Each structure stands twice: as structure tokens, then as C-alpha cells.
Amino acid sequence: MTGWSCLVTGAGGFLGQRIVRLLVEEKELKEIRVLDKAFRPELREEFSKLQNKTKLTVLEGDILDEPFLKRACQDVSVVIHTACIIDVFGVTHRESIMNVNVKGTQLLLEACVQASVPVFIYTSTLEVAGPNSYKEIIQNGHEEEPLENTWPAPYPYSKKLAEKAVLAANGWTLKNGGTLYTCALRPMYIYGEGGPFLSASINEALNNNGILSSVGKFSTVNPVYVGNVAWAHILALRALRDPKKAPSVQGQFYYISDDTPHQSYDNLNYILSKEFGLCLDSRWSLPLALMYWIGFLLEVVSFLLSPVYSYQPPFNRHTVTLSNSVFTFSYKKAQRDLAYKPLYSWEEAKQKTVEWVGSLVDRHKETLKSKTQ
């Protein structure tokens, strides 16, 4: 156990940063390697300040670059793989998503075998399980239910294939004769300071007289705070490195939620921003069934125009379903196998996130002020 090291891919991202901040507190960790395509200068500076007893090495490169991955994995004890393209709206080209999310994961697994890395933790997503229909209700779902996303949309499809590859790699023989142990974590919708979807919703509202656009008023979900998802990764690596706990965790996937109240996406955005005068759109909205079929018609238009023009619909059947389903999950299995319990309460998570939303509001005010001067 002495002098181990950890590689975190996607370490410049929303979740990856939080994992790194928790990792530096781990005992006997000699080095953290943070990998991403590029790191913002301010994040590089923050990472440099985290260094105390633990060396922190910044690696910039492509997840599809095999020699780069092999170098990154050399002498590493644990890989936490969070790097991926997240695109629920279909903005990014399908081939790019499949390459990064699926091929990149496969190349990283192969690099682990060559470098004899014994532990691999994959950040999956709730979307590999669905929802497949807004009419299907899943409340307090669990890992024993045979749920699988059937949408052809590239993001959930790529994450599903990548997760299958990671779990199938459990038990592979490493170059040094050891064994690779893997597991996957499926977090709910993640919110918190720096959250890209929440940030987009808040900034859009600030430019729309403080009115929050409806993104999912018919949904019931259990969002999870980013700090708790990061904590689950720490517990997963501890479990896979513990000879007593590892057998029950190897090759398994876990839903990661916390004690955030079950609610709609719209309500979450409102709760986190109402202190600053933001409000929900009170205008009449279309019935869900009609929105679904309009989404279908927009898909048809996009398909018909595709030979001459790339039309990106504002929504489609998949996004309508994703944003308006009753789809909640329990973290009991993670509690049992990983000794997971949320590090942050709902009240703590809410307070931290609201403070961050306040910083977005202040920045918006400063921007308006500078434009009028």
C-alpha cells in the first residue's frame, strides 16, 4: 500500500477537479497525475497550490494518443477515468463522441494492461440505464433492475459501450502477471459550483430578465452534489485496493446519489437561484405528448435537410424524454459495498451552490456595468 500513485483523466473538468482536491488528502499517495486535453492557467495554479506531501504532475494530451497514454500510466497504481465528451443535445459530431468516449476508454484500458495498472474506476452516467420513455416511471431504482438505454443518441450510447468495456476488462491479466480490477460509477445529474448545465441555465436567465427557461418541469429526479460524486470515487478506489472489500466491488457498477430532495430539473434551478430574484417561466407550456411529437417532426426536418444543411433542432424526442421523466435511484448498493454515505448534506450542498450562483450574478452585473460606461 505504501507510496501509491493515481492518474485522473478529465481532471480539468467539473467533476475531475473535485476528485483531485479530495485525492490530495489520501494517505501514502505519492503522486497524482492530472490529464486533460488542456488546462486553464488558473486551474494549473490551483493544482500547484494543492501540492504538499503529494507530487502533482500535469499532463496535457489526447485520449486517443496511444504512446501518450502509455507514458501517463507508467508506474501508476490507480486510474480514475472521467474524461469524455458530454453532449445531450447532439451538437458534437457523432464520430468524435464515439472516438473519445469509446475508443479512448478502450485505449486507456490497454495502456493499463501494458503498464500493469491494477485498479481502474470509470465515471459512467445514469443515462446508460435510460430513461427510454417519459411514460415509464422508475422510483428508487437499483442495480439489480435490468435497465438499459435504447436511444441511438451518441452520448448515452457511447457511455453504455464504454462502461461495458470497462466491466468486461475486470480480471484481465496485466503485463507483470497481476490482475486488473475495475468498477463503474453511475452518478445522477450532477450539480454544484462550476456545473456547466446549471451555469448555462443561470446565465441564460440573467440575459432574459431573470426568467429561468423550462428544461424539465414534468421530471422527478434525484440530482447529486458534485462533492459527493467525487467522494464516491475516493471510496471506490479505497475498496478496490482493499483485499477484503475488493471481491464484492470488482466488475460492479453503482448508482451514486445523495440526500438532495427528489424534484424536477426546473425546481432545482429555481431553488438554487431564487435568492437572486430569478423566477420560473409562468407562461403556459405545451403538453408533454405534444412536445414529444414536435420533437419527432424536428428530427424529420433535420434528416431531410442533412444532405444540404446541418440543422440542429432545439429539442428532440430523446431530450424531451430525458428532461421530463420520473427517474430516481437509490445509493444502497454503494453504501453496502463502498461504505458510501454523502460527505455533504443537502443543506451544505445547497449553500455552496447558491454562493457560486451569486458569483455568476455579480459577474453579470459587472459585465452590464462595463458595457454602459
Swiss-Prot record:
Predominant location category: endoplasmic reticulum
Subcellular location: Endoplasmic reticulum membrane; Mitochondrion membrane
Name of a matching Pfam family: 3Beta_HSD
GO molecular function: 3-beta-hydroxy-Delta5-steroid dehydrogenase (NAD+) activity; 3-beta-hydroxysteroid 3-dehydrogenase (NADP+) activity; 5-alpha-androstane-3-beta,17-beta-diol dehydrogenase (NADP+) activity; oxidoreductase activity, acting on the CH-OH group of donors, NAD or NADP as acceptor; steroid Delta-isomerase activity
Transcription among keywords: no
Expression sites (tissue/organ): Adrenal glands, testes and ovaries.
Entries under InterPro entries matching the protein: 3Beta_OHSteriod_DH/Estase (IPR002225), Lipid_A_modif_metabolic_enz (IPR050177), NAD(P)-bd_dom_sf (IPR036291)
Annotated family: Belongs to the 3-beta-HSD family.
Name of protein: 3 beta-hydroxysteroid dehydrogenase/Delta 5-->4-isomerase type 1
